[in-house]
């Protein structure tokens, strides 16, 4: 016998354009964890404060956040499974408007005579606001295609299956280096780069950097450094609604 499903409408209600929800999912879900040790990290957190909706995905090593302005003031904090969100955006058309209802247990997505309901993830989502840098000691504006291509070319050079890249940045040159005792090394200079601030040298996960650049989907990327071994901010200089944060890794040399 097919089980009874409770489709009682939750009390919190807000409306999103389908294109906005698609942007939220494409720019945050990739950063969610794919491991079940901390279930709350496998979902996208929707945190509404007033009429601002902050959507965040993190696996504790990186953060992706998208901010959307709502038509009405709301106050809720829920975490929706990233897989459920992916299924929703596959089902909607760009022209759709989505009514979203939520409480502490479930969320409903209502559009075009369709209801998609999902359970929420229990647990407290981490306070990601505290890792977002509020200032920087240096920054660089780079061509997205050049830096993505440079990182992608070195993807086969790995340490313990992790693709590490070292950024050596100055006002003279910006190098992207990789090294593996078993495979070899590479060193490329970015030719389309505008750099400001003090010199800095940091190692980070190249796969995470590439994911962030691809998710931003812009021609130029702004990379801001807040200091040695401090979080790296990656953003679209023409769109303040989305940002990516990467946690540096202890250097291999």
What are these regions (language model features)?
Residues 1-253:
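Structural preference for solvent-exposed beta-strand-turn elements
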């Amino acid at each position: 016998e097919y089980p009874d499903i409770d489709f009682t409408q939750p009390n919190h209600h807000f409306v999103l354009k389908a294109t906005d929800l698609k942007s939220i999912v494409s720019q945050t879900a990739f950063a969610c964890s794919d491991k079940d040790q901390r279930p709350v990290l496998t979902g996208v957190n929707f945190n509404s404060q007033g009429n601002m909706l902050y959507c965040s995905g993190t696996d504790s090593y990186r953060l992706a956040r998208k901010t959307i302005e709502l038509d009405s003031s709301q106050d809720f904090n829920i975490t929706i499974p990233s897989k459920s969100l992916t299924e929703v955006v596959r089902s909607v058309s760009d022209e759709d408007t989505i009514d979203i209802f939520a409480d502490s247990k479930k969320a409903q997505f209502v559009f075009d005579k369709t209801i998609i309901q999902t359970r929420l993830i229990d647990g407290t989502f981490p306070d990601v606001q505290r890792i977002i840098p509020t200032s920087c000691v240096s920054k660089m504006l780079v061509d997205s295609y050049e830096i993505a291509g440079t990182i992608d070319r070195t993807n086969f050079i790995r340490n313990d299956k992790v693709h590490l890249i070292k950024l050596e940045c100055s006002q003279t040159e910006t190098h992207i280096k990789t090294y593996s005792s078993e495979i070899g090394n590479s060193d490329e200079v970015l030719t389309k780069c505008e750099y400001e601030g003090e010199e800095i040298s940091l190692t980070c996960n190249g796969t995470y950097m590439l994911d962030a650049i691809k998710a931003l989907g812009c021609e130029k990327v702004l990379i801001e450094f807040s200091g040695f071994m401090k979080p790296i901010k990656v953003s679209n200089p023409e769109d303040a609604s989305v940002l990516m944060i990467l946690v540096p890794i202890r250097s291999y040399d």
